[in-house]
Curated annotation (Swiss-Prot):
<dbReference type="GO" id="GO:0005200">
    <property type="term" value="F:structural constituent of cytoskeleton"/>
</dbReference>
<dbReference type="GO" id="GO:0000280">
    <property type="term" value="P:nuclear division"/>
</dbReference>
<feature type="binding site">
    <location>
        <position position="71"/>
    </location>
    <ligand>
        <name>GTP</name>
    </ligand>
</feature>
<dbReference type="GO" id="GO:0005634">
    <property type="term" value="C:nucleus"/>
</dbReference>
<dbReference type="GO" id="GO:0048311">
    <property type="term" value="P:mitochondrion distribution"/>
</dbReference>
<keyword id="KW-0460">Magnesium</keyword>
<keyword id="KW-0342">GTP-binding</keyword>
<keyword id="KW-0493">Microtubule</keyword>
<comment type="similarity">
    <text>Belongs to the tubulin family.</text>
</comment>
<dbReference type="GO" id="GO:0005819">
    <property type="term" value="C:spindle"/>
</dbReference>
<dbReference type="GO" id="GO:0005737">
    <property type="term" value="C:cytoplasm"/>
</dbReference>
<dbReference type="GO" id="GO:0007052">
    <property type="term" value="P:mitotic spindle organization"/>
</dbReference>
<feature type="site" description="Involved in polymerization">
    <location>
        <position position="449"/>
    </location>
</feature>
<comment type="subunit">
    <text>Dimer of alpha and beta chains. A typical microtubule is a hollow water-filled tube with an outer diameter of 25 nm and an inner diameter of 15 nM. Alpha-beta heterodimers associate head-to-tail to form protofilaments running lengthwise along the microtubule wall with the beta-tubulin subunit facing the microtubule plus end conferring a structural polarity. Microtubules usually have 13 protofilaments but different protofilament numbers can be found in some organisms and specialized cells.</text>
</comment>
<dbReference type="GO" id="GO:0000235">
    <property type="term" value="C:astral microtubule"/>
</dbReference>
<feature type="active site">
    <location>
        <position position="254"/>
    </location>
</feature>
<feature type="binding site">
    <location>
        <position position="140"/>
    </location>
    <ligand>
        <name>GTP</name>
    </ligand>
</feature>
C-alpha cells in the first residue's frame, strides 16, 4: 500500500490537523473512537483509507500521524477533545517550554531537545508501512515552532528518507493580518532552510481565508475553526485520489512531476471551488464549467496575489464527485481560449487532470454547503512571486534597523544567517522572474551577452 505520514507542527499545524482528521473520519465512516461506523462500513470496503490509517488487531483505525508542539496547551486540547481515543498517546508529543515566536528557539535550543524523540516516533510509524510514499508536513511560517522546529524536522526527514516525497502545507503570513511582529524573520529563515528539502509547498494565508469566509460564506467574524475547516476541505481534495477510487487518480509523486518545472519553483497557488453557504447553494448550478471558471478568479485563492499579472507554468485540476472527463475537457478548452489567462510559451499543454468519484463530505454544523462536485486547482504561477516580494520588503524594514535580532542571536544563531536567508529569497524572486520570460526573450538576451 502507498502510505502517507502526516506531521502536524506547532499550533497552526495542530489545529489544521484536527480539522483534517475530523473530515477524513467522516469521509471514511470512522467514528471518533477509531472504530468503523457499522452503517457506513459497506460503502468503505475499498480499503483506500489505509494510506492514512493503520488498522490494529481489534479492528481500530489509527491515523498515521504525529502531532508535535514545544508547549503542551494546544495538543492537550486534542488529548481531552472528542477525538482523544482516535490517536495513540505516543503520537502526541509536547515539550515543556514555548518557542516564543522565535525561529532560533524552535530550530536550535528548545527544538533540539525534542527532535530525536519525534524522529524516533516517525520511524516507528514508517516501519509499520509496507510502501511509504511520503510525508505531509503542516505548519505555519510565522510561529516559532512552526518555522524553527518545522525546518529542523524537515532536515532530519531529508537525511533519513531521501527518496520519499516531502510536501508542506504552510500558513503564510498575510499581507494585513499579522499574529506576531517577527513573522517576516521567521518566514524568511524557514523558507531558506527548507527550500532545498521540501518537494512541494502549498501555501495558505489567513487573510485570503478570512475574505473567503466573509464573502462566500457570509460569516461576519470568522473564527480559526471556520478557517481550518475550509483548509481541511482543500487538503482533503488534494489527498482524495490517494484515498478513494476514481477515473483519473493522482499520486503524490505525480503532483511534483506535473507542477514543479524547476526544483526551487515549488510553491503552487491553491484555489478551491465552489465555496458557498447553504443559503446560496440552492441558487447555483455548480456545473463543471462554472466551478472551473471560479478557480481562475482571484477571490477563491488561498494566497493574496494577482494571477492575471503573472503567467501560469503548470496547472493541476483535481475534481471530486459527479464529474465526467468530457465535461472537464470542454471546460479546459474554454479556459485556454480566454485571453486573460496567460501561459508561459515553453509549456504548451499546461493542464493535469485528476478525477475522484467521491463527492466532498459535509461536516455537521459547518457553514460550507453540501455540493455534488468540487474542484481544487493547484497552479504554479509566476504571480506568487508577489507574495515573496511583500514578505522580503517587511523583512528589510525590520532588518535595516536590526530590530529584534538579539533574541535570535541569544539563542545561538549567527547573524550571518539572516543575510544569507534574505539573499536566498532574493534569488528565488529572480528565479520566478526568469521563468516568466518568454523563451524568445531569453534567447535574445543571451545573444546580447
Amino acid at each position: 500500500m502507498r502510505e502517507i505520514i502526516s506531521i502536524h507542527v506547532g499550533q497552526a499545524g495542530t489545529q489544521i490537523g484536527n480539522a483534517c482528521w475530523e473530515l477524513y473520519c467522516l469521509e471514511h465512516g470512522i467514528q471518533p473512537n477509531g472504530y468503523m461506523n457499522p452503517e457506513t462500513a459497506s460503502q468503505n470496503s475499498d480499503g483506500g483509507f489505509s494510506t492514512f490509517f493503520s488498522e490494529t488487531g481489534q479492528g481500530k483505525y489509527v491515523p498515521r500521524s504525529i502531532y508535535v508542539d514545544l508547549e503542551p496547551n494546544v495538543i492537550d486540547q486534542v488529548r481531552t477533545g472528542p477525538y482523544r481515543d482516535l490517536f495513540h498517546p505516543e503520537q502526541l508529543i509536547t515539550g515543556k517550554e514555548d518557542a516564543s515566536n522565535n525561529y532560533a528557539r524552535g530550530h536550535y535550543t528548545v527544538g533540539k531537545e525534542l527532535v530525536d524523540e519525534v524522529t524516533d516516533k516517525i520511524r516507528r510509524i514508517a516501519d509499520n508501512c509496507s510502501g511509504l510514499q511520503g510525508f505531509l508536513v503542516f505548519h505555519s511560517f510565522g510561529g516559532g515552532t512552526g518555522s524553527g522546529f518545522g525546518a529542523l524536522l524537515l532536515e532530519r526527514l531529508a537525511m533519513e528518507y531521501t527518496k520519499k516525497s516531502k510536501l508542506q502545507f504552510s500558513v503564510y503570513p498575510a499581507p494585513q493580518v499579522s499574529t506576531s511582529v517577527v513573522e517576516p524573520y521567521n518566514s524568511v529563515l524557514t523558507t531558506h532552510a527548507t527550500l532545498d528539502l521540501a518537494d512541494c509547498t502549498f501555501m495558505v494565508d489567513n487573510e485570503s481565508c478570512y475574505d473567503i469566509c466573509r464573502r462566500n460564506l457570509d460569516i461576519e467574524r470568522p473564527s480559526y475553526e471556520n478557517l481550518n475547516r475550509l483548509i481541511a476541505q482543500v487538503v482533503s481534495s488534494i489527498t482524495a485520489s490517494l484515498r478513494f477510487e476514481g477515473s483519473l487518480n493522482v499520486d503524490l509523486a505525480e503532483f511534483q512531476t506535473n507542477l514543479v518545472p524547476y526544483p526551487r519553483i515549488h510553491f503552487p497557488l491553491v484555489t478551491y471551488a465552489p465555496i458557498v453557504s447553504a443559503a446560496k447553494a440552492f441558487h447555483e448550478s455548480n456545473s463543471v464549467q462554472e466551478i472551473t471558471n471560479q478557480c481562475f478568479e482571484p477571490y477563491n485563492q488561498m494566497v493574496k496575489c494577482d494571477p492575471r499579472a503573472g503567467r501560469y507554468m503548470a496547472t493541476c485540476l483535481l475534481y471530486r464527485g459527479d464529474v465526467i472527463p468530457r465535461d472537464v475537457q470542454a471546460a479546459v478548452t474554454t479556459i485556454k481560449a480566454k485571453r486573460t489567462i496567460q501561459f508561459v510559451d515553453w509549456c504548451p499543454t499546461g493542464f493535469k487532470i485528476g478525477i475522484c468519484d467521491r463527492p466532498p463530505q459535509h461536516i455537521e454544523g459547518s457553514e460550507i454547503a453540501k455540493v455534488d462536485r468540487a474542484v481544487c486547482m493547484l497552479s504554479n504561477t509566476t504571480s506568487i512571486a508577489e507574495a515573496w516580494s511583500r514578505l522580503d520588503h517587511k523583512f528589510d524594514l525590520m532588518y535595516s534597523k536590526r530590530a529584534f535580532v538579539h533574541w535570535y542571536v541569544g539563542e545561538g544563531m549567527e547573524e550571518g544567517e539572516f543575510s544569507e536567508a534574505r539573499e536566498d529569497l532574493a534569488a528565488l524572486e529572480r528565479d520566478y522572474e526568469e521563468v516568466g520570460q518568454d523563451s524568445m526573450e531569453v534567447d535574445y538576451m543571451e545573444e546580447e551577452y
